[in-house]
Amino acid sequence: MSAAATADTTSPHIPVLLPAILDAVAPVQGVWLDGTFGAGGYTRGLLEAGADRVIAVDRDPLAFEMAADWAGSYGTRLVQQPGVFSEMDTYAVALDGVVLDLGVSSMQLDLAERGFSFMRDGPLDMRMSQEGPSAADIVNEASAETLANILFQYGEERASRRIAKAILTERALAPITTTLHLAGIIERCLPRAKPGQSHPATRSFQALRIAVNDEYGELYQGLMAAERALKPGGQLAVVTFHSVEDRMVKRFLTARAGAGGNANRFAPEVQRDAPAFTLRSRKAIVADDAEVAANPRARSAKLRIAVRTQAPAGVIDAKSVGMPVVKVGN
């Protein structure tokens, strides 16, 4: 039986802030690229709103398996493109819009065998593309220092060193190969969660998932790829779910819109590229109370939108956008 056949379809992935995106970028027309196809919520929303064509990109083969029942109804208006959004400018250029949802799809969380969830017992995997080193490889092979850095830099876990030490102690007895095994180790290192608080393993699982899939590197490269792929007047909409992602997106768009200013007013004026984007708003768009009530996942979501100018695409270094970098290895 395929993974698509075993996925839980009773609790479908609800696209966060979709009405806000469609309202902000209206009228929806031309060719759009959905860089995080997932369960297809944004793609379908764009097509129903009037996009001539949507190029749907995802590195997870399961995404396209799950879409088999409905994708054909859109005919040639829906183009399924296996791959990563950091390479979007090799799939298409002169795009009218790009949308990125940086959250994990519920279809991935719902499948225990994918190893993303600390609430379901399964192999400690977390690979979106199902290729390359898994979370188990990192947990069982990385040094204590590397593990602590991953947990702190990628998950903002303040107990990172305590957890890393506990992982090394546990793996000396037996390999850590399942999600619940790892979650139990982390739980023993932290106070019990109070009502309304997130599970103690939330930050650590987030950090490992980011490391396994190089999510920050993908985001950094993807933002520059979007700048190259969008035509003048094309719109970029990015939905983030935690502070590091949002900081990276905000700094990128602010810098590429020429709105950063000099850090020191006494420093000499720095020669800047012509602005490649204009910001739709200085502040991020967040979900209203009604959406949060209907979809609790929307509580932490932030949407930022910018419009491409006619200026040539440029380059910005990773440090300037605040991208954390941890060398994953012993």
Curated annotation (Swiss-Prot):
A Pfam short name: Methyltransf_5
Predominant place of localization: cytoplasm
Keyword DNA damage (UniProt): no
Enzyme Commission identifier(s): 2.1.1.199
Annotated binding of S-adenosyl-L-methionine, by residue: 40-42, 58, 85, 101, 108
Gene Ontology BP term (one): rRNA base methylation
Source species, domain of life: Bacteria
Catalytic activity: cytidine(1402) in 16S rRNA + S-adenosyl-L-methionine = N(4)-methylcytidine(1402) in 16S rRNA + S-adenosyl-L-homocysteine + H(+)
Described function: Specifically methylates the N4 position of cytidine in position 1402 (C1402) of 16S rRNA.
HAMAP family, alphabetized: 16SrRNA_methyltr_H
Name the UniProt record assigns to this protein: Ribosomal RNA small subunit methyltransferase H
Organism of derivation: Roseobacter denitrificans (strain ATCC 33942 / OCh 114) (Erythrobacter sp. (strain OCh 114))
